[in-house]
Amino acid sequence: MSRPCGLPEPVRNNLIDDAKARLRKSDVGTRYSHLSSNKFSVLVPLLARGGKLYLMFTVRSDKLKREPGEVCFPGGKRDPVDTDDTATALREAQEEVGLHPHQVEVVSHLVPYVFDNDALVTPVVGFLDHNFQAQPNADEVKEVFFVPLDYFLHPQVYYQKQITQSGRDFIMHCFEYKDPETGVNYLIQGMTSKLAVLVALIILEQSPAFKIDFDLHDLIPSCERTFLWRYSLSKL
């Protein structure tokens, strides 16, 4: 498991504070929490190291029946013990990679995502403690790795797939990332890549090197309109 190197605390704090301020401007809070009983949450984990921001990803265990080997964020279905979307994301992250709640600061909730037409996924964005060391649960997680946040605006290897839903075209972003330390190649796509691009757009406030279906001048409202349209067509 590769991990980015550290940086002086004042620099790290400034980097994190700037990112937090931008994320909070895009926070939808609990605005859509009432919409479905079939609820899921994912934790979108950020880490500041070496003067840069990174996203942490997991590779699903080959033992899993659904999507084995896929790259994703920690997360899963809400349990009766979960009080809210954040509780689900934190519980799943602890089960999957050994992340305790005190090791992450939750900053914002992004616009939900309609997954497989019958599940409502809430992205919960948080900053990891800079000393956090992942301890993957082998039954659920095969690997943990980090990717620089700016890779999701200026990638080295990238392609798109076109998806059509009810007459509307959408872009699936596909990123191939080679870990510089291990040489392992990862494919990041689907909902996971969509969220990574959105977080990069919010925090870095830069135009990407590829076509997107977000409105850069009206980012969160445009995401909300797309979500509500998809929700209206779903089984939720």
UniProtKB/Swiss-Prot annotation:
Provide the pH dependence.
Answer: Optimum pH is 8.
Binding positions for Mg(2+) per the UniProt entry: E92, E96
**Entry's InterPro entries?**
CoAse (IPR045121), NUDIX_hydrolase-like_dom_sf (IPR015797), NUDIX_hydrolase_dom (IPR000086), NUDIX_hydrolase_NudL_CS (IPR000059)
Checking Gene3D superfamilies in the record gives: Nucleoside Triphosphate Pyrophosphohydrolase
Motif Nudix box, per the record, lies over 77-98
Annotated effect of mutating R66M: No significant effect on Km for CoA
The cofactor named in the record is: Mn(2+); Mg(2+)
Protein name as catalogued: Peroxisomal coenzyme A diphosphatase NUDT7
- What's the superkingdom here? Eukaryota
**A Gene Ontology biological process annotation?**
propionyl-CoA catabolic process
Give the record's subunit note: Monomer.
Record family assignment: Belongs to the Nudix hydrolase family. PCD1 subfamily.
Annotated site, Important for coenzyme A binding, chain positions: R66
Identify the GO cellular component terms for this protein. peroxisomal matrix; peroxisome
Locations listed in the record: Peroxisome
One molecular function GO term is:
manganese ion binding
Q: Where is the Nudix hydrolase domain?
A: 37-169
Which residues are annotated with the PTM N6-succinyllysine?
K20, K178
The UniProt note on how this protein's activity is regulated states: Inhibited by fluoride.
Q: What is its EC number?
A: 3.6.1.-, 3.6.1.77
Instruction: Please name the top-level EC class of this enzyme.
Output: hydrolase
One Pfam match, given by its short name, reads NUDIX
Short sequence motif Microbody targeting signal: positions: 234-236
What this protein is reported to do is described as:
Fatty acyl-coenzyme A (CoA) diphosphatase that hydrolyzes fatty acyl-CoA to yield acyl-4'-phosphopantetheine and adenosine 3',5'-bisphosphate. Cleaves CoA, CoA esters and oxidized CoA with similar efficiencies. Preferentially hydrolyzes medium-chain acyl-CoAs and bile acid-CoAs. Has no activity toward NDP-sugars, CDP-alcohols, (deoxy)nucleoside 5'-triphosphates, nucleoside 5'-di or monophosphates, diadenosine polyphosphates, NAD, NADH, NADP, NADPH or thymidine-5'-monophospho-p-nitrophenyl ester.
Q: Which gene encodes it?
A: Nudt7
**Could you tell me the keywords of this UniProt record?**
Hydrolase, Magnesium, Manganese, Metal-binding, Peroxisome, RNA-binding
